[in-house]
């Protein structure tokens, strides 16, 4: 696309924003660090989501309850702290396609993965191995390797890393199925990312879950890049367990709380091991101070400590946005927005050392396009995009820059600015 054509395309992007406006008005958008626009073109919501405008007032309301009531706020606050986490249960269940008893919001993501693996990674005999993606987020890799060591196993031989075929960037579901069919009797746990953090590939969760369970393995999912990004139906897909964070697409703020899903078939299993604490016991008898926990037959049994109220408020505020907009509408806009960014990138990447590595099929990706650069540093390119053009993206060294057109608040003009910035920053070779 020539420069004059790119200029004309800006008008088309503005028309698309008029016809398909999204919900940007509900969020605070940071100012641009450079370029000719006042606001940043923020395409880093897959790293940290923007702050909903309602969050500040709601957080201050919880702070005011603490100031005004002290300890009495546990029962007397407008939103009493003792059952506060229950306010998140129904909207969380709707978000991930679960029954309310199957979900709870608590802790952070990797902590929850460890707590879940206490229950669901139970190596016995030859069935000891854990399957993850070769490009899994490092924290997941560290977690499963440490779980192997905890059980006295060699992590190098216990952890199976699924890699794409030579010359390809993403996994094929058929290859995952083939591995599970051929070696399933040695696999105790399959733990994959629902959307791969690096490539943006949306895994075929129902198919892989069915294949893993048919092989006799437990199947869990890290949904950090899937929750709030793509529609989920965890109960119907028969997923054993899942966990996700809330600070990316769910916009709960840096380090925001994690969500947990445990399928209802496991909830009343008395043989399932689990770490317990004060909040593991049923609420009705919690303050009887019994020395023996009486866990409820819900995902709340995986709780250990009382929840941080000031961290739960932003999650609640964000979930209200998702309830009001709906995942179906968000997904439809996401497909349109990401498709437009893909088309724009196709206009500016020819002749430049840039290649989109995210699947081209909209059904195999969420709100992310990852671009591999052929020369230079990904971090340096992301820095130039931000400082010279006000485009905020996320670099993953050594050579990937990730762009996330989040359907809640990203615009078609944001996507145009990405293409314009890349055309101005990356030279044609």
Curated annotation (Swiss-Prot):
Source species, domain of life: Bacteria
Catalytic activity annotation: L-kynurenine + H2O = anthranilate + L-alanine + H(+); 3-hydroxy-L-kynurenine + H2O = 3-hydroxyanthranilate + L-alanine + H(+)
SUPFAM superfamilies with a match to the protein in the record: PLP-dependent transferases
UniProt EC number: 3.7.1.3
Modification N6-(pyridoxal phosphate)lysine occurs at: 248
GO cellular component, one term: cytoplasm
Known cofactor(s): pyridoxal 5'-phosphate
Pathway: Amino-acid degradation; L-kynurenine degradation; L-alanine and anthranilate from L-kynurenine: step 1/1; Cofactor biosynthesis; NAD(+) biosynthesis; quinolinate from L-kynurenine: step 2/3
One MF term in the entry's GO annotations: pyridoxal phosphate binding
Transmembrane segments: none
Keyword entries, A-Z: Hydrolase, Pyridine nucleotide biosynthesis, Pyridoxal phosphate
One family name in Pfam for this protein: KYNU_C
Binding-site residues, pyridoxal 5'-phosphate: 109-110, 137-140, 222, 225, 247, 278, 306
Listed GO biological process terms: anthranilate metabolic process; L-kynurenine catabolic process; L-tryptophan catabolic process to kynurenine; NAD biosynthetic process; quinolinate biosynthetic process
Subunit structure: Homodimer.
Sequence similarity: Belongs to the kynureninase family.
Functional note: Catalyzes the cleavage of L-kynurenine (L-Kyn) and L-3-hydroxykynurenine (L-3OHKyn) into anthranilic acid (AA) and 3-hydroxyanthranilic acid (3-OHAA), respectively.
Listed name of the protein: Kynureninase
Species of provenance: Salinispora tropica (strain ATCC BAA-916 / DSM 44818 / JCM 13857 / NBRC 105044 / CNB-440)
Gene that encodes it: kynU
């Amino acid at each position: 696309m020539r420069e004059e054509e790119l200029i004309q395309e800006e008008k088309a992007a503005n028309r698309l924003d008029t016809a398909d406006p999204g919900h940007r008005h509900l969020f605070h958008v940071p100012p641009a660090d450079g370029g000719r626009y006042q606001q940043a073109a923020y395409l880093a919501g897959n790293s940290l989501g923007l702050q909903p405008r309602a969050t500040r007032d709601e957080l201050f309301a919880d702070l005011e309850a603490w100031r005004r009531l002290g300890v009495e706020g546990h029962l007397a606050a407008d939103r009493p702290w003792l059952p506060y986490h229950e306010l998140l249960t129904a909207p969380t269940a709707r978000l991930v396609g679960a029954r309310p008893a199957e979900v709870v919001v608590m802790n952070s993501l990797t902590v929850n993965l460890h707590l879940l693996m206490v229950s669901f990674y139970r190596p016995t005999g030859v069935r000891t191995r854990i399957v993850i993606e070769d490009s899994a987020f490092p924290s997941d890799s560290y977690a499963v390797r440490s779980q192997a060591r905890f059980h006295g196993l060699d992590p190098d031989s216990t952890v199976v890393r699924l890699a794409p075929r030579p010359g390809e960037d993403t996994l094929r579901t058929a290859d995952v199925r083939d591995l599970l069919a051929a070696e399933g009797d040695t696999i105790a746990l399959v733990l994959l990312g629902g959307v791969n953090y690096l490539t943006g590939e949306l895994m075929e969760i129902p198919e892989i879950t069915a294949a893993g369970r048919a092989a006799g393995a437990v199947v869990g999912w890290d949904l950090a890049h899937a929750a709030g990004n793509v529609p989920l139906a965890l109960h119907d897909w028969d997923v054993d367990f899942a966990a996700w964070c809330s600070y990316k697409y769910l916009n709960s703020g840096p380090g925001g709380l994690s969500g947990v899903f445990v399928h209802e078939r496991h909830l009343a299993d008395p043989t399932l091991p689990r770490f317990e604490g004060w909040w593991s016991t049923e609420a009705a008898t919690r303050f009887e101070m019994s020395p023996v926990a009486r866990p409820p037959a819900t995902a709340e049994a995986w709780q250990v400590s009382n929840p941080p109220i000031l961290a739960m408020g932003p999650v609640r505020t964000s979930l209200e946005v998702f309830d009001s907009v709906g995942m179906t509408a968000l997904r439809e806009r996401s497909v349109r927005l990401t498709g437009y960014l893909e088309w724009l990138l196709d206009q500016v990447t020819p002749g430049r050392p840039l290649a989109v590595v995210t699947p081209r099929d909209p059904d195999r990706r969420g709100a992310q396009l990852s671009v591999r650069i052929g020369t230079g540093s990904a971090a340096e390119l992301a820095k130039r995009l931000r400082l010279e053009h006000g485009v905020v993206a996320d670099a993953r060294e050594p050579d990937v820059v990730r762009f996330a057109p989040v359907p809640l608040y990203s615009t078609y003009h944001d996507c145009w600015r990405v293409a314009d910035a890349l055309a101005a920053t990356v030279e044609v070779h």
